[in-house]
A protein has these predicted regions:
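Active-site loop of classical SDR/Rossmann-like NAD(P)-dependent oxidoreductases
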Residues: 85-87
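Short alpha-helical functional segments enriched in proximate histidine and acidic residues
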Residues: 4, 8, 51, 122
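A glycine- and Lys/Arg-enriched "phosphate-lid" helix/loop adjacent to the NTP-binding pocket
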Residues: 82
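Conserved amphipathic alpha-helical segments that form helical-bundle/coiled-coil interaction surfaces
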Residues: 14-78, 89-97, 102, 107-118
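Short, charge-rich amphipathic alpha-helical segments embedded
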Residues: 115-132
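Conserved segment of winged-helix/HTH DNA-binding domains
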Residues: 1-17
Length: 133
């Protein structure tokens, strides 16, 4: 769902909005954000995701994305608890921002899907390992 939101939002983003997204993505690289507790990193990622999705031009789709994002926020915290995983996420966000900058909706939406898939996989691995102890 998020990839559709990103795909539809890409042509709607103004230069100023793309710059704001880029600055938030840069904030993900901040040492304290990347290597400290994951709450700040997750909050920025969540904000970027909803900011982009809001520009999709479809209020119903945005509401579905927002609802799904709220429901999976706990799993995002689990998935991004590790600094190595946050660094991988940061690189994907940087790629997504770069594709948004040149209005490449296909690749931006592909990266959005990778972000969701990677977080889901990481959360599932964490939950599986915590159930074995």
């Amino acid at each position: 769902m998020i990839e559709l939101g990103v795909f539809l939002a890409t042509p709607n983003l103004s230069d100023a909005e793309k710059q704001r997204i880029s600055s938030w993505v840069d904030a993900l690289s901040n040492h304290d954000t990347l290597h400290g507790p994951n709450e700040h990193y997750v909050a920025i990622s969540y904000h970027i995701s909803l900011f982009i999705s809001r520009r999709c031009g479809n209020d119903r789709l945005f509401e579905m994305i927002r609802s799904m994002s709220r429901q999976t926020l706990r799993y995002s915290h689990l998935a991004l608890r590790d600094t190595v995983r946050r660094d991988t996420s940061r690189k994907l966000w940087k790629n997504l921002s770069d594709f948004l900058a040149v209005r490449d909706a296909a690749n931006a939406s592909k990266i959005a899907r990778e972000l969701v898939d990677a977080s889901g996989k990481s959360a599932r691995m964490y939950l599986a390992s915590s159930n074995q102890t």
